[in-house]
Swiss-Prot record:
Pathway listed: Amino-acid biosynthesis; L-lysine biosynthesis via DAP pathway; (S)-tetrahydrodipicolinate from L-aspartate: step 3/4
Lineage of the organism: Bacteria, Bacillati, Bacillota, Bacilli, Bacillales
Species: Staphylococcus haemolyticus (strain JCSC1435)
GO cellular component: a single term: cytosol
Subcellular location: Cytoplasm
Major localization listed first in the record, in broad terms: cytoplasm
Keywords, ordered alphabetically: Amino-acid biosynthesis, Cytoplasm, Diaminopimelate biosynthesis, Lyase, Lysine biosynthesis, Schiff base
This protein's name: 4-hydroxy-tetrahydrodipicolinate synthase
CDD domains, sorted: DHDPS (cd00950)
Gene symbol of the encoding locus: dapA
Length: 294
C-alpha cells in the first residue's frame, strides 16, 4: 500500500488570540502550508498544545482543517493518550470527521511494558480501523517502543508508520531492519537530523520548523530525492534550528508563526512565551534566513 505521505508533514501549531483558538489565523496558516507544498498536516499533536485544548476544541480544529484541506494532502489526527479507552473514543471522533490517519503516542505517567504497548496500540487500531502512525518520543514520555515491538506492531494491517523522535540512528537502523518499508513508513520527529535520516532511506519528517518554512523544508526533501547533496542547503536551516532551540517546543515556533501573522504570540499555561529579548533574537535570525544571509 502507498505510504501516508513522502516528504514533509507539518506538526501544526494552534493559533490563539485572547486565549481562544483563532480560526481565521488557523485558516491563513493552513493556506500558507498548502501553498508551499507540504504533503501532510498533523493536527492536535505536541506542537498544537493538545494537552491544554479541550476535547471540543480538538474536534473543532480538526474539523476546520479537514474541511479546508479538502483531500489535497493527508490529515493525521493526534488522538493518543495514556488511556486506551479514551484514545479509542478520540480516534473514532477523528475518523467520523474525516481524518486520513491517527497518530498515537506511547502511554506516559502510567507507563506500561512492551506487552502492554502492543495491546494498547493494537486494541486502538483494530477498533478504529484507520491507519495508525506510532509516535515514539522518549524524551517526553520516558517510554520507548523497542524495535522488536515495532516489528510486531508493523504486522497489524492498520499500523503503517512510526514517527521516530529518538534522534538515535542505532535505533532507526534496528527498526528499519525489522520492517517492510514498502508497507511501513519511517518518519523523523527531529528537524535537525533530516539530512542523515533521508540519506538512510527515511520516508519524510513530521516537522515543527515547517510551520514557518514549509517551502524550504520540502525543497530539501525533493532535492535529496533527485540525487543532490543537500548538506550545504541544510546549513542555513541548521542555524535557524539552533535559534529555535532556545526553549522547548512549541514556545519558539509560535514566536515565528505569530511573526508571520498567524495569531497572537500566545500559549496556554503551563507554557509561557519567550522573554522579549529572546524572541527578538529568534525573529532576527529568521529574517536573516529569509533574506539568504545565514
Amino acid at each position: 500500500m502507498p505510504h501516508l505521505f513522502e516528504g514533509v508533514g507539518v506538526a501544526l501549531a494552534t493559533p490563539f488570540t485572547n486565549n481562544e483558538v483563532d480560526y481565521n489565523a488557523l485558516e491563513k496558516h493552513v493556506d500558507f502550508l498548502l501553498d508551499n507544498g507540504v504533503k501532510a498536516i498533523i493536527v492536535n499533536g505536541t506542537t498544537a498544545e493538545s494537552p491544554t485544548l479541550t476535547e471540543e476544541e480538538k474536534e473543532q480544529v480538526l474539523e476546520s482543517v479537514i474541511k479546508q484541506v479538502n483531500h489535497r494532502v493527508t490529515i493525521i489526527a493526534g488522538t493518543g493518550t495514556n488511556n486506551t479507552a479514551k484514545s479509542i473514543q478520540a480516534s473514532q471522533r477523528a475518523k467520523a470527521l474525516g481524518a486520513d490517519a491517527i497518530m498515537l503516542i506511547t502511554p506516559y505517567y502510567n507507563k506500561t511494558n512492551q506487552r502492554g504497548l502492543v495491546k494498547h496500540f493494537e486494541t486502538i487500531a483494530n477498533e478504529v480501523e484507520l491507519p495508525v502512525v506510532l509516535y515514539n518520543v522518549p524524551s517526553r514520555t520516558n517510554m520507548t517502543i523497542e524495535p522488536e515491538t515495532v516489528e510486531t506492531l508493523s504486522h497489524n494491517q492498520y499500523i503503517v508508520a512510526i514517527k521516530d523522535a529518538t534522534n538515535d540512528f542505532e535505533y532507526y537502523e534496528d527498526v528499519k531492519s525489522r520492517i517492510n518499508q514498502e508497507e511501513f513508513a519511517l518518519y523523523s520527529g527531529n528537524d535537525d537530523n533530516v539530512v542523515e535520516f533521508y540519506q538512510r532511506g527515511g520516508n519524510g519528517v513530521i516537522s515543527v520548523i515547517a510551520n514557518a518554512i514549509p517551502k524550504e523544508f520540502q525543497a530539501l526533501y525533493d532535492a535529496k530525492q533527485s540525487g543532490q547533496d543537500i548538506s550545504n542547503d541544510f546549513e542555513p536551516i541548521s542555524k535557524l534550528l539552533d535559534a529555535l532551540s532556545v526553549d522547548v517546543n512549541p514556545i519558539p515556533i509560535k514566536a515565528l508563526t505569530s511573526h508571520l501573522g498567524f495569531g497572537n504570540y500566545e500559549l496556554r499555561l503551563p507554557l509561557l512565551p519567550l522573554e522579549d529579548a529572546d524572541a527578538k533574537v529568534l525573529i532576527n535570525v529568521f529574517e536573516q534566513f529569509k533574506a539568504g544571509e545565514l
